[in-house]
């Protein structure tokens, strides 16, 4: 849903047409805020319930303050001990900071989160930006989008400098730590960039 939102924001709302939806889950697009964000009129009616502890609708983040608010709203959704919630908060913060600091995404990052009764949470962060390959190729040579993703997952690799270990402000360790945290916890994260896909 975040990817649809990010892509949709690149299109003039006058050029977006929404056909009559037949799916029983059509209210989900309204409830998660997709149609409102894209300024698409909807005649879908539903009973709105408090989202607390279940989901966070699509949220557009362009500043550190907006990121802090999102993470604050996200913590109750996690249903975790404070230490575990802090780790997830770090991951989301690091990924969104990558968008804010590196991607030059005009619309910032688009996030949403959903908690499932099976004790699973899905968090999606999307943007329409330069892409990892363009950013990494400022300092390194990646032949493909997948090569760029693989480089970005190595510690000390950042698109801001070729200096080993990055810089004081940007050590190039965020994605490496996130990959490691996911691996240790037997979780996973997915990166799509250009034509590259990593899971």
Predicted segments with their positions:
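Internal, well-ordered alpha/beta segment that forms a basic, Gly-enriched binding/recognition surface
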Residues: 36, 42-67
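Flexible ATP-lid and adjacent glycine-rich G1/G2 motifs of the Bergerat
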Residues: 138-197
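Short beta-strand element(s) in the Bergerat
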Residues: 119-123
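Conserved ATP-binding N-box helix of the HATPase_c
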Residues: 5-7, 82-116, 175-182
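Acidic ATP/Mg2+-coordinating residue in the GHKL
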Residues: 127
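Intrinsically disordered, low-complexity linker/loop segments enriched in Gly/Pro
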Residues: 57-85
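Amphipathic alpha-helical interaction surfaces in cytosolic regulatory modules
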Residues: 1-39
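Glycine-rich G1-box
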Residues: 130
């Amino acid at each position: 849903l975040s990817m649809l939102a990010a892509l949709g924001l690149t299109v003039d709302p006058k050029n977006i047409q929404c056909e009559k939806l037949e799916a029983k889950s059509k209210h989900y697009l309204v409830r998660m805020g997709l149609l409102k964000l894209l300024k698409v009129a909807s005649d879908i009616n539903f009973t709105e319930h408090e989202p607390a502890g279940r989901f966070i609708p699509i949220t557009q983040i362009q500043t550190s303050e907006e990121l802090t608010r999102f993470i604050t709203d996200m913590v109750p959704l996690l249903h975790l001990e404070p230490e575990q919630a802090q780790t997830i908060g770090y991951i989301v913060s690091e990924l969104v900071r990558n968008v804010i600091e590196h991607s030059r995404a005009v619309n910032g990052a688009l996030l949403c989160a959903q908690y499932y009764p099976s004790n699973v949470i899905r968090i999606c962060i999307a943007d329409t930006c330069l892409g990892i390959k363009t950013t990494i190729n400022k300092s390194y040579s990646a032949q493909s989008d997948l090569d760029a993703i693989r480089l970005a997952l190595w510690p000390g690799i950042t698109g801001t400098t070729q200096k080993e270990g990055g810089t004081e402000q940007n050590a190039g360790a965020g994605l490496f730590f996130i990959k490691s945290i996911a691996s240790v916890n037997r979780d996973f994260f997915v990166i799509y960039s250009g034509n590259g896909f990593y899971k």
